[in-house]
């Protein structure tokens, strides 16, 4: 597992819940790939998580991945909370079912394939890749609205 990859990711939501988008940049050396998508009825946290999932799913072999995101929910979930949720049967510290369990389980599966370092950065603070991911997410929302496909 020697290939080192950087994944920058962000999610956006117009209304929460509402129409949402996600954006990601995969970087391996000098090569970059941009990814994005959108959904009609979602939340900001789901889009943040989806950005990371889609980026990790795009990798064709096991890698060392540095995931950089402005989502404390995502970083803390993966580095601090996940083991407790699993130990308690997917119940949080308030004894309530963990939200977005489907996405946490997918991230857990992907973390078995890749060696992942989760890194938090402050959002909307001039970080070039984070700003680009935000633009990708918002662009995906705009595209979905223009197409009007999948509208409930």
Curated annotation (Swiss-Prot):
Keywords from the named record: Cytoplasm, Endonuclease, Hydrolase, Magnesium, Metal-binding, Nuclease
Catalytic activity reported: Endonucleolytic cleavage to 5'-phosphomonoester
Residues binding Mg(2+) 1, per UniProt: 10, 48, 70
Cofactor(s) the protein requires to work: Mg(2+)
Any one of the GO CC terms: cytoplasm
Enzyme nomenclature, EC number: 3.1.26.4
Enzyme class, first EC level, given as a word: hydrolase
Annotated CDD domains: RNase_HI_prokaryote_like
Protein family per UniProt: Belongs to the RNase H family.
Subunit: Monomer.
Described purpose of this protein according to its UniProt entry: Endonuclease that specifically degrades the RNA of RNA-DNA hybrids.
Protein name, UniProt field: Ribonuclease H
Organism: Geobacter metallireducens (strain ATCC 53774 / DSM 7210 / GS-15)
